[in-house]
């Protein structure tokens, strides 16, 4: 019997609170290791998707987002376009609207979804 082929999504973490996790010893927020996404967000196991991740290292404070980083996002998407059915960009909320606007022009001819999202709370909260 063949294994089912699930849709695949590339999760791109640029920075922002959504990609932080609380250090249990200090209570401080630290950058989350997205290689451990499924272990830390077990709800994702309910979906029939393959989720891979790419992280900006170090994470970008969204107030520092600029056109060169928009170009980097576009390159990541184009370099991985044939491997994934869609892309989710995790972004800081301060400048997400600017990035979304820029990417809407830079990626206007794509036939796959690109979703931007952020949060005021860290991942898993």
Question: What kind of feature is each model-predicted range?
Answer:
Residues 1-125:
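Active-site histidine-anchored catalytic micro-motif
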